Structures are given as C-alpha cells and as structure tokens.
Amino acid sequence: VAFLQEQGFEVTILPVDGHGVVKLDALEKALRPDTILVSTMMVNNETGAVMPVEKIGAMIQEKCPKALYHVDAIQAFGKYRIYPKKWNIHLLSVSSHKIHGPKGVGFLYINSKAKVQPLILGGGQQNGMRSGTDNVPGIAGLGVAAKMMYQNFDEKVEHLYQLKERMAEGLSKIDDVVI
C-alpha cells in the first residue's frame, strides 16, 4: 500500500466491523468510476474473519466494472471453495506453505481482464511474466498439496465443523468464558 501511495496512487483503507469484516456500506461509498483496483483478504490471517468476497465482487462489478478485484486467498485456499469467475475475482493469490506444500512457491490466478506486467524482465519464462528457471519441484509439490486439500473436501469440512462445535460446547461449560 505504501508503495502505491509513493507512486502517486490514492489509497482508501476501509473500516471493519466488530468481527473484523470489511463494512460493505463503506466499500460502496468508496467505489468511484476511477477506481482501478480493490484488494481484500478472503480470510484474515490473524483474526480468522471471513470477508464476503462474492458480495464485494458483485458490488465492484456493478459500481465500477473497469476495476480489478484482487483476493488474497492464502488463508482460504484448501479450506473454502473459491469461484473466481462467478465471484468477479480478477486476481487471486495463493501460497503453497499454507496448504502443507513447499515453502517459496505459490500461484497467482489472473483473469483475462487483468493485464499485468512482469516484475522481473528477462528470459520470457512463464509466458513472459517472470524471468528465471521454473521451480519444478516446488510447482509439483504445490500441485500435489492442492489436490490433497480438495480430496474429500466436504468430509473434511464437516469434520472440522464437528470439532469446532465440540470445542465451543466444552468452553461454554467453563465459568467466565464467553464465546
């Protein structure tokens, strides 16, 4: 954010509610015809707050259809089903180490609407988006980790829900604990 401000871009930081979720009314007021990018986390890495990315994507599409929507899905990938096209997400970032894959590798989903420029110029690898040798073992490890995260996905989600309910039930029996 600071880098963009230093480059002369106007940056708007939006308020969140008591649960850490971006206030949609504030977003709606902040969106303007000259808005070029909105970036949110899908799940906050510190609080666990889940952003309403589908609603945000629809709002951006309606209010400023030329703007791009970036979602940091690093905490969400493998734990939620994510539908970039349906949710009007143009850029989606994921990191391998958050899904038990190798460190130092990830991916950026880029919708055809998003015209991005490479950060490192050179050899033209990765469709001209990044110079240098592909990290083939890391990429393969990310692929395996992603596949494993989504195998039996519904059963895993149900199991985690049951664990959460069991923990909440146990904690609620302790005096002075508020959930």
Give the predicted meaning of each segment.
Residues V1-I179:
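Pyridoxal 5′-phosphate
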